[in-house]
Amino acid sequence: SVGFKAGVKDYKLTYYTPDYETKDTDILAAFRVTPQPGVPPEEAGAEVAAESSTGTWTTVWTDGLTSLDRYKGRCYHIEPVAGEENQYIAYVAYPLDLFEEGSVTNMFTSIVGNVFGFKALRALRLEDLRIPTAYTKTFQGPPHGIQVERDKLNKYGRPLLGCTIKPKLGLSAKNYGRAVYECLRGGLDFTKDDENVNSQPFMRWRDRFLFCAEAIYKAQAETGEIKGHYLNATAGTCEEMIKRAVFARELGVPIIMHDYLTGGFTANTSLAHYCRDNGLLLHIHRAMHAVIDRQKNHGMHFRVLAKALRLSGGDHIHAGTVVGKLEGEREITLGFVDLLRDDFIEKDRSRGIYFTQDWVSLPGVLPVASGGIHVWHMPALTEIFGDDSVLQFGGGTLGHPWGNAPGAVANRVALEACVQARNEGRDLAREGNEIIREASKWSPEFAAACEVWKE
């Protein structure tokens, strides 16, 4: 027969290949697929593979001009999800050539760009990605990473402490700087712009940057410790964002901040490159993540967004708190926390890790625990997150009955007490409350905090 057979075709003929051996250079994806009633899982998995790589809905004659076998995504394994009706994990392998080097943007446009609106799928969620070393090596990754940050700040052997300045909107720049100074002076390492503090009429960015820099230098001089404030450089255009980063560098401050999901991966990667070139640390806030990751059966799991951030670049990223949540959440959270920090992570389905990931010396990212935590949580946080983390107490600092500086003192004393107890071999999980009670005898600020937030 001449030419090709026209017409709509079954995807699974071409894109479902259960005997495929994955290559070390393939990007692997694990999708949670919920097919429409009557659609077989193989067809659904093959549709995902096709639409996120080379496929289109009908046979086209230009297929003959390329080697589909070389460029197509392949659904190579499907397994039913235990305890769920009509839900499957579909594993898809993508050849590396489908992706532009060093572009998280292109990676996501390809893998999740189009396929989530498919008629044959009731819902679709990207659970995990395996980034091959060949692709990882095309990214710069975090501007500095955990070890370099410790060296820059001269802080070792303990988690770092932060605080988001509240009320987040409405303070003038001078009063904002004053709150920053009080927290840093009291003993915190960092204070933070709220994610929605950009440059509003009541506080323009340049004024805020100046007063915060003044607060940093004054607190440093008085405490002899290196201090920082996450100056939010997020802006309406990339040019404006870089302008703010340049001003921060000129002020000589150690760290700036970006909202990477609302700002976008392209902007974030540009900013990360600027930060490495100019010695700035980069704090990343994940505003908008729940829009993408909250639904259990549709969207994208946060561990994928976390991996993407490590490629795109950031030195800190918000990662939830675990404290007071369900036990299962804890394992899953620790799974992606390790994905952020470690060089090599073994596949472990109980922690939600679908693939073994080798980061080949890409620097690590510090996870930031923040949201509704206070001094009584300190033992649990120290135990769960370990030294390589940032613990952020917004209300847990500024809500102290005696003011911001005593609130900062309370958190620092709590942290030092927990680290000391841990180093002496005590069990923070079991003796946490006891450790807190003992230490509060030596610090009136700490005792007052314990009283306010006792459970």
Curated annotation (Swiss-Prot):
Its EC number is 4.1.1.39. One of its GO terms (cellular component) is chloroplast. The disulfide bond which can form in the large chain dimeric partners within the hexadecamer appears to be associated with oxidative stress and protein turnover. Coiled coil: none annotated. CDD domains: RuBisCO_large_I. InterPro entries: RuBisCO, RuBisCo_large_chain_AS, RuBisCO_lsu_C, RuBisCO_lsu_C_sf, RuBisCO_lsu_fd_N, RuBisCO_lsu_N_sf, RuBisCO_lsuI. Its cofactor is Mg(2+). Heterohexadecamer of 8 large chains and 8 small chains; disulfide-linked. The disulfide link is formed within the large subunit homodimers. The basic functional RuBisCO is composed of a large chain homodimer in a 'head-to-tail' conformation. In form I RuBisCO this homodimer is arranged in a barrel-like tetramer with the small subunits forming a tetrameric 'cap' on each end of the 'barrel'. HAMAP family: RuBisCO_L_type1. RuBisCO catalyzes two reactions: the carboxylation of D-ribulose 1,5-bisphosphate, the primary event in carbon dioxide fixation, as well as the oxidative fragmentation of the pentose substrate in the photorespiration process. Both reactions occur simultaneously and in competition at the same active site. This is Ribulose bisphosphate carboxylase large chain. It comes from Brownea coccinea.
